């Protein structure tokens, strides 16, 4: 059986167990979270969902009456990297993909237990999974299983059924009786029987009904034997296979000493003249030895408690349990009141126990407490520590605090992009709209709507193109040549007025500050090398202010220590640089609006002689 540095070898699940759910099975995940909540867990057992067909996202689920967000990852590698504490996977992959996904999961050493829910996994594939699991020291539950449950700790997928059934079977707190069965449906019946005849279930596993389960009866019974909290075991076998005989041998040779109450389902099969299969792929007898009658007799002779019929199993179980209580082996604990189960909003509105799904998600600010917070930083602290507008941008846009040189750079960008005179398209649109008598918002928006790939919108493109070329290892000349072959302009290169001999002072200011304060300027250096190539062809193909700000911004994100490379690239792709231009230029556009209003400028009409009329 699999072991762990933190857990004894017999323990698969505990109150601290964290799991992935493979497949978009939000209903099953919600059931697991509801069970966690009922058991008094402080942290949900499901750390994330792995869904290979979608994009990385989040899934909204309930934790009690509140909503929480679970990450959804596209790859197993990413999920394991982000959540190294996870060691269990509930695999809801279909029968077609269960093999491939399980084999991939076993490549990650942190995974020590996988429950395969799918039915119909080809037997050859199931055997391959079995062999690999033993090599990798991974416990496999299934295929074709509902899973398992450890009351008060963890449940696999839909094990245990609805919440009312879980409460009725007292699965929210541990008992002393552990069981193992093939059938998931019959495991629910065992939960019910054990809860009414003993102090409850300690752990229950349904190994699955296929012919080649990843683990068998004996595997789990040996675990239960080693677990001091388990005092009594129940085995529910069935016609077909010989796994019950391995249990018999373990009882005879003393490997298993704890009492077992057992029954093999399918005794009526001996009444049929031909071979009969009872539902599961492995539930048919190939010989007299595999019949339920023979198994029950053999178990009875080995000293296992076996009733005359299944109907008498509850009474026998209660008798054995009470005997252990009298001997002091089991000390019943005081019964705890069943926890309240959160109800859906429509049912619980009048009672005040509501689940109201939110329509929007906000992760940057919160106005619900006594004080407004920006990314959990109180507004008073923003002023006490003089974070400034750069600090506020770092909190609300980048969701973290940046070093002072970084926030000053953000403010520098806003100052440099605030205005570029009245003749550029954005300012002209704002001026004309203002002179038409429109209000500030309308005039501002008129100017902002001109921002795009030709005006002001080159920052994101420059950041992306230079980053891509640098990361790909292209030399500056190779980058320029590739753009020329693609008939594509290089974003951030070129100026209508400025040139190498008439440099843009704004660019010089940015370069000077960045070279002095940034820990690394690799992308800026790369862009300047590209400029050397482009200006050798034409003097005005310089690194303009958009391009300079863009590459310096990438250097900031990648080297300030607050972001991973993945996070830095994500923010660039989100359009944050164009956001900086929009925010900065809004200052100037508002200035032009106020200027025209103050001058009481009349309605503007463009002169005829500035148009070429063709009709």
From Swiss-Prot:
Where along the chain is Mg(2+) bound? 238
Q: Which GO terms describe its molecular function?
A: ATP binding; ATP citrate synthase activity; metal ion binding
Q: Which GO terms describe its cellular component?
A: cytosol; nucleus
Give binding positions for CoA.
299-309
- Where on this chain does ATP bind? 221-241, 272-298
- Leading EC class: transferase
Where found, per UniProt? Cytoplasm
Q: Which domain of life is it from?
A: Eukaryota
Where on the chain is Phosphoserine found, per UniProt? Answer: 359
SUPFAM superfamilies found in the cross-reference section: Citrate synthase (SSF48256), NAD(P)-binding Rossmann-fold domains (SSF51735)
GO terms (BP aspect): acetyl-CoA biosynthetic process; citrate metabolic process; fatty acid biosynthetic process
Q: What is its EC number?
A: 2.3.3.8
Biological role? Catalyzes the formation of cytosolic acetyl-CoA, which is mainly used for the biosynthesis of fatty acids and sterols.
Family to which this protein belongs: Belongs to the succinate/malate CoA ligase alpha subunit family.
What is the protein's quaternary organization?
Composed of two subunits.
Write the protein's name. Answer: Probable ATP-citrate synthase subunit 1
Which organism is the protein's source? Schizosaccharomyces pombe (strain 972 / ATCC 24843)
What broad taxonomic lineage does this protein's source fall under?
Answer: Eukaryota, Fungi, Dikarya, Ascomycota, Taphrinomycotina
